[in-house]
Structure formats: structure tokens, C-alpha cells
UniProtKB/Swiss-Prot annotation:
Substrate binds at residues 31-34, 86-89, 99-102, 126. This is Ribose-5-phosphate isomerase A 2. One of its GO terms (molecular function) is ribose-5-phosphate isomerase activity. The lineage of its organism: Bacteria, Pseudomonadati, Pseudomonadota, Gammaproteobacteria, Enterobacterales. Pathway: Carbohydrate degradation; pentose phosphate pathway; D-ribose 5-phosphate from D-ribulose 5-phosphate (non-oxidative stage): step 1/1. InterPro entries: NagB/RpiA_transferase-like, Ribose5P_isomerase_typA_subgr, Ribose5P_isomerase_type_A. It comes from Yersinia pestis. Catalyzes the reversible conversion of ribose-5-phosphate to ribulose 5-phosphate. Pfam families: Rib_5-P_isom_A. Gene3D superfamilies: 3.30.70.260, 3.40.50.1360. Keywords: Isomerase. Belongs to the ribose 5-phosphate isomerase family.
């Protein structure tokens, strides 16, 4: 990751704190590199006295939050969350997203739907005209996973996405295991997902699919950082 991209992520993190985070809020802290920039920036404000109740969408984010002095709460002990800040792997101009490059998509979607608002935070490289260049992750249970993979391939074809390479995500020679103990199938669709909402719904109807990385309803706004250190806000 270049220094310019880091500057863009940091600019977005600072802008979202400036415009959307207030004393006394309950916050969901998202996953991924841009979200971690946000969490580190947030830690500086907490150290100066900002009072927040926070939960996270992954074990990795929990580690970052604790490292910067942010106390975390069990989401089961929280009421509706005021705001979740999370980052996409891709986002289009209609606020449709692909998330899950860090294999945290299930927890991310749970916390997003437990929140009054979700603001997407990203750098300029994540903005796309059409989703799909980034592989679409589908979280599946390990049992009979090959059968589930075949059904995923069939649904993709029914939605106009034919001959899509589907690869079970690996790491260190072993299948990647999510925080919930599941596998990830990465669907290399190409930038041709023109109807993400019905695809999201149909994938989730497959027995064995836990969740997929299309987020079509969650984001209420985006904060985008640019390489020159500037940022902008767009609301839905």
C-alpha cells in the first residue's frame, strides 16, 4: 500500500470522526485496513476524553481497538447501535458494496443491520462503476461444501453470470476459516454485476450459504479520501 493511499485512508478516517462521531454514541467498528485507520484515529479522541460504547465486526478489529485504548462491549448487551463505520472492497455510486476480503462479512452484516446508520469509509480506489472486479465472497458451512459450491455456480448463471471461476479461499496451504468457523468461496465474476440486489437475495437462499459479500441496503453514506489528503461526504 502506497503512502498516498495511506494518506487517503487517514483523510477519510479523520473526516468521518469530524462529521459523524459524537460524545455518548454507540459505535460499530468495521473491519479492513481503512476501518483500522479509523479505529486508530478514534483511539486518539478516546484518550482525550471522548465517551463511546463500541463493538467490532471482527477479532482483528478488536485487537486494534484494544491496542489504542478503546474499551469494547458485547453486542448482546447493547441496544440498537447508533452508527457503524465500515469499509468496502468495492462500492458503486448507488452505495452497493462488495465486502468480505478479510473474511468478516457475516459479522459485518450483522452489526450493520443492528445499527441506525452505516457510513462507508474508503479511499478513492474503491469507487467503481460496476461491482465484481473484486471477487465476491460467499461464506458457507464446511459440511458438503462442494454441493453448496455447485448451487452457488447455478445461481450465478441464473443471474446472468456464466462460467464464473469459484475458488475456496486458502491461506498457508489450508482453507481460510472465518471467525464463525466457516469457509469462503471467492466468485471471480468480473466487473459485470449489474443487478446486485437480487443476486444477494438468491445466494442467501441456498442451503449451506451463511451470508454473501453483497451489501445493497446498508450504507446510508460514504466518506471518501483522496490521495492529495482531501475527502468528501456523500449521503444516500
Amino acid at each position: 500500500m502506497s503512502n498516498q493511499q495511506n494518506d487517503a485512508k487517514r483523510a477519510a478516517a479523520r473526516r468521518v470522526i469530524q462529521d459523524f462521531v459524537f460524545d455518548g454514541m454507540t459505535l460499530g467498528l468495521g473491519s479492513g485496513t481503512t476501518s483500522h485507520f479509523f479505529v486508530r484515529e478514534l483511539g486518539q479522541h478516546v484518550a482525550k476524553g471522548l465517551q463511546l460504547t463500541c463493538t467490532t465486526t471482527s477479532r482483528a478489529t478488536s485487537e486494534v481497538a484494544r491496542d489504542v485504548g478503546i474499551e469494547l462491549s458485547d453486542p448482546n448487551e447493547m441496544n440498537e447501535i447508533d452508527l457503524t463505520i465500515d469499509g468496502p472492497d468495492e462500492i458503486d455510486r448507488r452505495f452497493n458494496m462488495i465486502k468480505g476480503g478479510g473474511a468478516c462479512l457475516l459479522w459485518e452484516k450483522i452489526i450493520a443491520h443492528a445499527s441506525k446508520r452505516m457510513i462507508c469509509i474508503c479511499d478513492e480506489t474503491k469507487i467503481v462503476n460496476c461491482l465484481g472486479q473484486f471477487p465476491l465472497p460467499v461464506e458457507i458451512v464446511p459440511f458438503a461444501w462442494k454441493q453448496t459450491e455447485r448451487r452457488v455456480e447455478r445461481v450465478l448463471a441464473e443471474q446472468g453470470l456464466h462460467h464464473v471461476p469459484i475458488i475456496r479461499r486458502m491461506g498457508g496451504g489450508h482453507p481460510v476459516i472465518t471467525d464463525s468457523g466457516n469457509f469462503i468461496l471467492d466468485c471471480h465474476c468480473g466487473a459485470i454485476i449489474t443487478a446486485p440486489e437480487p443476486l444477494e437475495i438468491e445466494l442467501n437462499r441456498i442451503p449451506g450459504v451463511v451470508e454473501n459479500g453483497l451489501f445493497t441496503r446498508e450504507a446510508t453514506g460514504m466518506v471518501v479520501g483522496y490521495f492529495d489528503g482531501s475527502s468528501y461526504v456523500q449521503l444516500r
